[in-house]
């Protein structure tokens, strides 16, 4: 299940990445080409749930991320790091069944795979601060 959920997160990340270059396009439409590659219907539904949730909360996600960036602004981040942080922040704050450690590990892996050699550490540092400052207290007991 973990490997399959990783693929789901990866498809959401790819859609967010592409959307960052095509802001005038609908994120859900962009996501279709990435999410459709997932073999499991339940994972496709989950991916669309993430996409819709991120669309609805993008402004607050960006505000929260900006609050925890040190010596950076959101628009100065690489497209990769910015969208991994959006996905990770959404999962930390709005997805109840995923422990904080799992979210951090998954986002670090996406950073290592798609970002620079420092992306994993950078993403981990920012998301760790966001988790400590913003995540629901119940997530610390999972």
Swiss-Prot record:
Pfam (any one): NusB
InterPro entries membership: NusB-like_sf, NusB_fam, NusB_RsmB_TIM44
Keyword Transmembrane helix annotated: no
CDD domains given in the database record: Terminator_NusB
GO cellular component: cytosol
Keywords: RNA-binding, Transcription, Transcription antitermination, Transcription regulation
A GO molecular function held by the record: RNA binding
Keyword DNA repair found: no
Biological processes, Gene Ontology terms: DNA-templated transcription termination; transcription antitermination
Record family assignment: Belongs to the NusB family.
Purpose: Involved in transcription antitermination. Required for transcription of ribosomal RNA (rRNA) genes. Binds specifically to the boxA antiterminator sequence of the ribosomal RNA (rrn) operons.
Alphabetized NCBIfam families for the sequence: nusB
Name recorded for this polypeptide: Transcription antitermination protein NusB
Organism: Thermosipho africanus (strain TCF52B)
Gene name per UniProt: nusB
